[in-house]
């Protein structure tokens, strides 16, 4: 491709409304342009990258044995009513009425459509397992679209759905998809983690997120320093090790009129925060226990996902208000604790190992110091209640935990029978009777992968693509003052044609521009391999090679340039 014939569309300045690096660089590199809130045109440079990511996803999915289909973006409301998600999904589901006064939606996902399709096409257990996928545009009417294509309203997604007659069969396909996703993100050259995840509202028995590590990520990712253990912070197990020490002091009731928070208590009484506990009151799951106390160490944070899964706690999790707490306990939020507590309590594992700790006395303006389990208060139920912190021991016993920010680019679920049951999707089983199909679903945000890659791989000059396979162009030819030097022009043209003949994805900057402008544009869009052709070097039979990723520069003989690139490209 010649730049003189190409829509490069680069910008020198960063648009004011672009908050994250990927949005800034995608606009500056001429990859996307906004059309409306959360809607973007993909320009040639952006589309080249998007299509290359899409092709990698497609190739690996096909290798896994999945079969590609394509389903409509527009879906009839009847399917959503049948699955009972018509009312549940909320305002993100864009609904409209056609000229025949029939309700439709723009598909944010395709569980309903694929379940209906397979129900109609598959009648026997002999036709299963089946794994169907598509790469297609989705639409979710986000209340606050932001960060460019990272969280837009329209996006490109690969969604796959598998159908089975047994949980064992589902697990086999799930394992295949887990490996396939690892292959995809490894091939993309990304630093990522496959993490155990909460199944959330989708439900199911197992779930993994694939997270690209980046400082701008919205999720906290926990992983071991010495093993493959990784989990979303919502699911990461907090291990407590060691033994509870014997009491060393007598429990004491202390006036603390100005200590409304843990920080107040620590500062005013010169306490160690690790020797304090905080008590949080939530709604109970049973009428006979309307309130439950959850107790964590003063320097730890309650993990609400873990708390919500406790059988004693109401789902969804709801914190009690000040009036409810005062009515039941007789003290305000800043003065609560396990001693003489009139409601059931559940304590975190780390709290169970504490001795001589400080806690609210359930009397406003008072705290107990030097409290000990079994001596001053009975040990309540113990559970994993907290978020892990950096340096905690890994649950698998190998190394310590690290925490980094991540961008979710893929998610796989074992759905079970949630949709097939609701939509009566059955096949004839081996025994001749109808059997409800068991489902799995597997998604990759293809357009989000592009943004996540840029978030992870960039510098002050622009984008550094993590893999040659997804760069908009693999090689750039940058001729210095080509229109003033016949030798430069002739060699540049010959090299360009040779690379085209070898099917190398090459961009030839044949513009009448200053070298500084040419370098800035090529480095901004992230072309990994640059061949710089200058008059002085050519006179010596040489050209200059520059690597965008490493910054390496090398002078090579012009006769060797094709062999040199053959060894470097996609290496």
Swiss-Prot record:
Main location: cytoplasm
Catalytic activity: tRNA(Pro) + L-proline + ATP = L-prolyl-tRNA(Pro) + AMP + diphosphate
Molecular-function GO term, any one: ATP binding
Superkingdom field: Bacteria
EC class name: ligase
Record localization: Cytoplasm
Keywords: Aminoacyl-tRNA synthetase, ATP-binding, Cytoplasm, Ligase, Nucleotide-binding, Protein biosynthesis
Alphabetized SUPFAM superfamilies for the sequence: Class II aaRS ABD-related, Class II aaRS and biotin synthetases, YbaK/ProRS associated domain
GO biological process entries: prolyl-tRNA aminoacylation
EC number from the UniProt entry: 6.1.1.15
GO cellular component: cytosol
HAMAP family, sorted: Pro_tRNA_synth_type1
Assembly and oligomerization: Homodimer.
NCBIfam families in alphabetical order: PRK09194.1, proS_fam_II
Family: Belongs to the class-II aminoacyl-tRNA synthetase family. ProS type 1 subfamily.
Comment on protein domains: Consists of three domains: the N-terminal catalytic domain, the editing domain and the C-terminal anticodon-binding domain.
Function, as annotated: Catalyzes the attachment of proline to tRNA(Pro) in a two-step reaction: proline is first activated by ATP to form Pro-AMP and then transferred to the acceptor end of tRNA(Pro). As ProRS can inadvertently accommodate and process non-cognate amino acids such as alanine and cysteine, to avoid such errors it has two additional distinct editing activities against alanine. One activity is designated as 'pretransfer' editing and involves the tRNA(Pro)-independent hydrolysis of activated Ala-AMP.
Name of the protein in question: Proline--tRNA ligase
Organism name: Histophilus somni (strain 2336)
